[in-house]
Swiss-Prot record:
InterPro entries recorded: Orf10_SARS-CoV-2
Recorded name of the encoding gene: ORF10
Binding partners and assembly: Binds host ZYG11B. This would not play any role in SARS-CoV-2 infection.
This protein's name: Putative ORF10 protein
Superkingdom, taxonomy of origin: Viruses
Entry-linked CDD domains: SARS-CoV-2_Orf10
């Protein structure tokens, strides 16, 4: 869990910043993260 949290936290911030440029791309990356964590 520790590794996932360390990776997911900055990635989430990056995704939120990316969301400003392209909402669809942000949603796609979130789906990828959810798939990997499942």
């Amino acid at each position: 869990m520790g590794y996932i949290n360390v990776f997911a936290f900055p990635f989430t911030i990056y995704s939120l910043l990316l969301c400003r440029m392209n909402s669809r791309n942000y949603i796609a990356q979130v789906d990828v993260v959810n798939f990997n964590l499942t």
